[in-house]
Amino acid sequence: YFYSGFMFFYNLGRNHKMPGSAQEIRYINRDENTHLWLFRNMILELKNEEPELFTPDRVDVYREMIKEGCRQEIAWGHYAIGDKVPGLTKDMITDYIQYLGNLRCMSLGFEPIYEGHEKEPESMAWVSQYSNANMIKTDFFEARSTAYAKSSALVDDL
């Protein structure tokens, strides 16, 4: 249930409303993208180590799981946002979530689950400008670091 929520705040941000909230959502989105990258890599490694888990029948089950997740995300977006928020429509929500479902499938080496949604919808290209932490440029002297700070670990010799 992330992207329907993210796009609501990003829509506010692109309309110059609540920019601080949009920035906070970007931090959350960045963290979720880190989790996405981690689990994608774990699944790809599992594909190499345990290929019997990725037979055509099992891949069909996995694709159906992704499709069900998309269905629930779309239903939530329609309920929470619907056609009541200026700048967002149910069709935009559906198109974008179906695109993300295809993106997730293809990144795992699976066939897309939604025909015609292999590319980011033009009506939603602005979401990428907010969701990709590397795409928004700021004035170097006015910007705060958004990177995680490295800490030195104490070594316990017990």
Feature map (PLM): residue ranges:
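Non-heme di-metal
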Residues: 1-158
